[in-house]
């Protein structure tokens, strides 16, 4: 029975392939970018087997060029792998590539894509991005969370200090730090279901970052059920939804009674969104689901990506002891004799900033960015990009291109000393947070959760590898997923540092 079902599916897919080929026969004059050979039904999918997507696509681009076409099942896709082509997509023709493709996971976990990251381009997206930039993640709001960051960093330092007799799972502790930091910023306090919630969010992000064959055959709705992915995502999402719904309703109740929700007395992120909901006057009134979608974006961008950046920074410094010593010396000289310091003081640490810049060059949080979708037929470099084409920018490859970076694969923070390259998408060879209209709106929030903990950990502890390990033994293997996190947990031994009081 199962055999006949598979045969039926194959025949049906074959029919769709022939039908699509017939429909597209009148557009053969369109000159698509070059790309690898294609098979019926699967298109270019076989070329993606056997490696991490951003690695495979970089290697294919070496053969087919910086603007490359792939046929992924039913989906037409273009991959950008040079600063010039990235500028065409993210600046010159930004409006034409400002939308997002429809994918299963964001449709579910982002409440029909009513978030910011996966929302299709239009008036609703413009409204919510404006709210995010001016209210939710404004510089003022990010600064208002400084006491929460200070408290969470203190917890992290105290945990490491209590574990100095054995190796610390650096990866695990930093994920818990960024998760707790985001929880308290969003919800105002540590809540009773926080640990369960953090694990559920981690599960949902993992599922959302997985490959689902139904996304490359969007016309075949039954594949979502057949692969089982929809059920897995729905199950985890319902649990997350119930927890956040309770938190929102508790906030509404407290506000109605004149109580503050944040343990520190200020507005948390839900308070901000509820205030805007109650004020009215918006073209698209905010609902509970809209709030939950924005909160999911916050956790997706503020936990996995920040903790991954911290881990990669430490991995690279442990592999390069001279760089570790230089970063540590800077922190300890700047705060000599102090027991602690806050994030305003971290502004003085110029070399630490270079370390983070170099970390993001080699390990951008989302190596292919969130994919864009072509809204109107566009010509780039003499090639036609059809409407609905999925566009991926390989920022991992851009950051390692030897045409633009000397000794591109090696970790050298000093390369940025005399370099004006920044994070905000103006330099197309360096786009760790994207560029154009869809650049990540949470850059300030994310970096604030990276600088302070890293500076504190370098200040308070001397670090070494577990017995028997050498710096060269630290591998750089990445996980498969939306984020390029390190595959193996980083285990380190910490020795408390006693600052001189002279």
UniProtKB/Swiss-Prot annotation:
Main EC class the enzyme belongs to: oxidoreductase
Localization per Swiss-Prot or TrEMBL: Membrane
Transmembrane segments: 2-22
Chain residues that bind heme: 440
GO molecular function: heme binding; iron ion binding; monooxygenase activity; oxidoreductase activity, acting on paired donors, with incorporation or reduction of molecular oxygen
Keyword DNA repair: no
EC number: 1.14.14.151
PROSITE patterns on file: CYTOCHROME_P450
Any single GO CC term annotated in Swiss-Prot or TrEMBL for this entry: membrane
Effect of residue 484 to I: Decreases catalytic activity. Strongly increased catalytic activity
Keywords: Heme, Iron, Membrane, Metal-binding, Monooxygenase, Oxidoreductase, Transmembrane, Transmembrane helix
One Pfam family here: p450
Function: Involved in the biosynthesis of solavetivone, a potent antifungal phytoalexin. Catalyzes the successive and independent hydroxylations of premnaspirodiene and solavetivol. The first hydroxylation step is 3-fold more efficient than the second hydroxylation reaction.
Family statement drawn from the similarity comment of this UniProt entry: Belongs to the cytochrome P450 family.
The name this protein goes by in its record: Premnaspirodiene oxygenase
Lineage per the UniProt record: Eukaryota, Viridiplantae, Streptophyta, Embryophyta, Tracheophyta
């Amino acid at each position: 029975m199962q055999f006949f079902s598979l045969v039926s599916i194959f025949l049906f897919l074959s029919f769709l392939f022939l039908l699509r080929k017939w429909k597209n026969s009148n557009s053969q004059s369109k000159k698509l970018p070059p790309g690898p050979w294609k098979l019926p039904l699967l298109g270019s999918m076989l070329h993606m087997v056997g490696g991490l997507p951003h690695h495979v696509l970089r290697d294919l681009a070496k053969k087919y060029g910086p603007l490359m076409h792939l046929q992924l099942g039913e989906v037409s896709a273009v991959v950008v792998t040079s600063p010039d082509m990235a500028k065409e997509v993210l600046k010159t023709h930004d409006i034409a590539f400002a939308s997002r493709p429809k994918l299963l996971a964001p449709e579910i976990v982002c409440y029909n894509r009513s978030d910011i990251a996966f929302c299709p381009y239009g008036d609703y997206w413009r409204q919510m991005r404006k709210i995010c930039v001016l209210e939710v993640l404004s510089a003022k709001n990010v600064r208002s969370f400084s006491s929460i960051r200070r408290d969470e960093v203190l917890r992290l330092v105290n945990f490491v200090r209590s574990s100095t007799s054995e190796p610390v799972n650096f990866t695990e502790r930093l994920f818990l730090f960024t998760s707790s930091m985001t929880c308290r910023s969003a919800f105002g306090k540590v809540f009773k279901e926080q640990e369960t919630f953090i694990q559920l969010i981690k599960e949902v992000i993992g599922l959302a970052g997985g490959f689902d064959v139904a996304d490359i055959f969007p016309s075949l709705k039954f594949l979502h059920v057949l692969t089982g992915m929809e059920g897995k995502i729905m199950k985890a999402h319902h649990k997350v939804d119930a927890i956040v719904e309770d938190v929102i309703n508790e906030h509404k109740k407290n506000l109605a009674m004149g109580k503050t929700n944040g343990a520190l007395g200020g507005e948390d992120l839900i308070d901000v969104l509820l205030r805007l909901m109650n004020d009215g006057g918006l073209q698209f009134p905010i609902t509970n689901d809209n709030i939950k979608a924005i909160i999911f974006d916050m956790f997706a961008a503020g936990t996995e990506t920040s903790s991954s950046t911290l881990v990669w920074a430490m991995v690279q410094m442990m592999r390069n002891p001279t760089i570790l010593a230089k970063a540590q010396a800077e922190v300890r000289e700047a705060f000599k004799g102090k027991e602690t310091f806050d994030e305003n003081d971290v502004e003085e640490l110029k070399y630490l900033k270079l370390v983070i810049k170099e970390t993001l060059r080699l390990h951008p949080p989302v190596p292919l960015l969130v994919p864009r979708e072509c809204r109107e037929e566009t010509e780039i470099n003499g090639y036609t990009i059809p409407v609905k084409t999925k566009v991926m920018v390989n920022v991992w490859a851009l950051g390692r291109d030897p045409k633009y970076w000397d000794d591109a694969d090696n970790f050298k923070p000093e390369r940025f000393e005399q370099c004006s390259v920044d994070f905000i998408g103006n330099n197309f060879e360096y786009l760790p947070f994207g560029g154009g209209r869809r650049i990540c709106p949470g850059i300030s929030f994310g970096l604030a959760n990276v600088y302070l903990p890293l500076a504190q950990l370098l200040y308070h502890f001397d670090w070494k590898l577990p017995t028997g390990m050498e710096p060269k033994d630290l591998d750089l293997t990445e996980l498969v997923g939306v984020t390029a996190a390190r595959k193996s947990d980083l285990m380190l031994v910490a020795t408390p540092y006693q600052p001189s009081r002279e």
